[in-house]
Regions:
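Glycine-rich phosphate/diphosphate-binding loop of Rossmann-like nucleotide-binding domains
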Residues: 1-48
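Glycine-rich phosphate/pyrophosphate-binding loop and the adjoining helix
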Residues: 1-5, 10, 16-19, 135, ...
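Hydrophobic alpha-helical scaffolding
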Residues: 16-20, 40-44, 63-64, 115, ...
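Short glycine/threonine-rich loop-to-helix capping motif typified by GTGT followed
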Residues: 20-29, 55-62, 79, 153-155, ...
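Conserved structured core elements
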Residues: 24, 44-48, 119, 135, ...
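Glycine-rich phosphate/nucleotide-binding loop
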Residues: 53-153
Length: 176
């Protein structure tokens, strides 16, 4: 993934100092795989220290590789750094397939109320397009979203506006 996406650094996030068997194995495998990609800088970090550092210096990180439990926690922390769950897409990319989805889940408590921010869903589709080799289409979607948010006219409630889900989506479509 890091090579294909032009990334420069991968950090394995673990708790191998305590979880010696499971996270120790994860870290050993990460280090072995890293040897196959000498052009990519590889580091590892204990999850709690990395979370503190990520908040203080997010620019130090590029790709974080985590076991599922830590990945779930770290991804929510990262969502907070960029404005919240409503803005955050996710990609789970494996050897033989990939899944793209909003990080926030289905939000059943506000289903049908037309007030959910669709940005994470739209950006997840953009990530999928990029993964499928449609970089221009992905970039166009990202630019449209950036433009709509920057203008501030069609923002959903979580971004301080009054626009409905559909109004925000329509504004993005209009930019495309």
């Amino acid at each position: 993934y890091a090579v294909r996406e032009g990334r420069k650094k991968v950090t394995a996030v673990h708790k191998a100092n305590i979880m010696k068997c499971t996270d120790g194995l994860f870290l050993d495998v990460a280090r072995e795989i890293a040897k196959e990609y000498p052009q990519i800088e590889f580091t590892d970090s204990i999850v709690d220290a990395m979370c503190m550092r990520l908040v203080m210096h997010p620019e130090e990180y590029d790709v974080l590789v985590c076991p599922n439990l830590y990945g779930d926690i770290v991804s929510d922390l990262c969502a907070g750094l960029v404005g919240g769950l409503g803005l955050t897409p996710s990609a789970n990319i494996g050897k033989d397939g990939a899944i793209f989805e909003p990080i926030h889940g289905s939000a059943p408590d506000i289903a049908g109320q037309h007030k959910i921010n669709p940005t994470a869903c739209i950006l997840s589709a953009s990530l999928m397009l990029a993964h499928l080799g449609e970089a221009k289409a992905a970039a166009a979607i990202e630019k449209a979203i950036t433009d709509v948010i920057s203008e501030g006219k069609a923002l959903t409630q979580d971004m301080g506006g009054t626009a409905s889900t559909e109004e925000f989506a329509d504004a993005v479509i209009a930019k495309l």
